[in-house]
From Swiss-Prot:
Protein name: Protein Bel-1
Gene name per UniProt: bel1
Region (Disordered): 1-20, 26-50, 185-237
BP terms from Gene Ontology: positive regulation of DNA-templated transcription; viral process
DNA-binding region, residue intervals: 89-200
Task performed by this protein: Transcriptional transactivator that activates the viral internal promoter (IP), thereby enhancing its own expression. This transactivation is repressed by nuclear factor I. Also transactivates the long terminal repeat (LTR) promoter, thereby inducing structural gene expression, initiating the late phase of infection. It is therefore a key regulator of viral gene expression. It directly binds to and activates DNA target sites of viral promoters and those of distinct cellular genes. Required for viral replication.
Species per Swiss-Prot/TrEMBL record: Simian foamy virus (isolate chimpanzee)
Length: 300
């Protein structure tokens, strides 16, 4: 917000109810019947214009609050006071609402877009507020599909229902509108022009989704192991010694005989091609058949 623009005051004393009187805080010179005026601080930069509110009362700065805390340490701390929505400025309330509806990155993205953010109380549910985004070029209005609620227990803005993934997001609609925006505001002389399509009430829409929507079953992260197809799962075939292939055509013996004929090192080649002597000795299993040893290592 521009520092030269006027800002609505945070004119509330709900957090100071434990104090005796306001005249004790600001001094007897300001305890009159008129509006409360806090003494102005000396201006460091005389060129900077003063910031006045609509009531011509200067906004209370952090330093003024700090002085009051130092003078009255036994009272409640003003920095611990959390303002309610009606006590917030519009800019602060807008940012807190967007952070309640979206993440911080999405809220920053919305604030950078050429839309003005506003909200109004829902006629269906007085506790809910409908957030609207108005294009600054063509005055098109986009309603957020998720209402926002003020949680008085924790004093923060929250979503009406945990259904953001179902009802959708307004960010995608705003991006789509930016690409197709006509950049021309509707003419006031032709009120018979096209009107925006009526949207469903976001509160009723969220209630309908919550009532009729059935969530999908979540997938398990761990893969289920099929014990019947696993060779090391207690299957008796895995513990039996013998040839791994019953088809004699794929055994190395006939293949080597066709290539080398009768050779002196044919048995050694068969052993190496079937897994080697180490495999035969330790696992007691090869494609040549049952081992010729004592069988102590025939079973894992």
């Amino acid at each position: 917000m521009d520092s030269y623009q006027e800002e609505e005051p945070v004119a509330s004393t709900s957090g100071l109810q434990d104090l005796q009187t306001l005249s004790e805080l600001v001094g007897p010179e300001n305890a009159g019947e008129g509006d409360l005026v806090i003494a102005e601080e000396p201006e460091e930069n005389p060129r900077r214009p003063r910031r006045y509110t609509k009531r011509d009362v200067k906004c209370v700065s952090y330093h003024a609050y700090k002085e009051l805390e130092d003078k009255h340490p036994h009272h409640i701390k003003l920095q611990d006071w959390i303002p309610k929505p009606e006590e917030m400025s519009k800019s602060i309330c807008k940012r807190l609402i967007l952070c309640g509806l979206y993440s911080g990155e999405k809220a920053r993205e919305i604030l950078k877009k050429p839309f003005t953010v506003s909200w109004e109380q829902s006629e269906t549910n007085p506790d809910c507020f409908i957030v609207s985004y108005t294009c600054i070029f063509c005055d098109a209005v986009i309603h957020d599909p998720m209402p926002v609620v003020w949680d008085s227990e924790v004093e923060i803005w929250v979503k009406y229902k945990p259904l953001r993934g179902i009802v959708g997001s307004a960010v995608f609609i705003m991006e789509k509108h930016q690409k197709n925006c006509s950049l021309v505001k509707p003419s006031t002389s032709c009120p018979e022009g096209p009107k925006p399509r009526r949207r469903h009430d976001p509160v009723l829409r969220c209630d309908m989704f919550e009532k009729h929507h059935k969530p999908r079953p979540k997938r398990s992260r761990k893969r289920s192991i099929d014990h019947e197809s696993c060779a090391s799962s207690g299957d008796t075939v895995a513990n039996e010694s013998g040839p791994l292939c019953t088809n004699t055509f794929w055994t190395p013996g006939p293949v080597l005989q066709g290539l080398l004929g009768e050779s002196s090192n044919l048995p050694d080649l068969e052993v190496h091609m079937s897994g080697g002597p180490f495999w035969k000795e330790v696992y007691g299993d090869s494609i040549l058949g049952p081992p010729s040893g004592s069988g102590e290592h025939s079973v894992l």
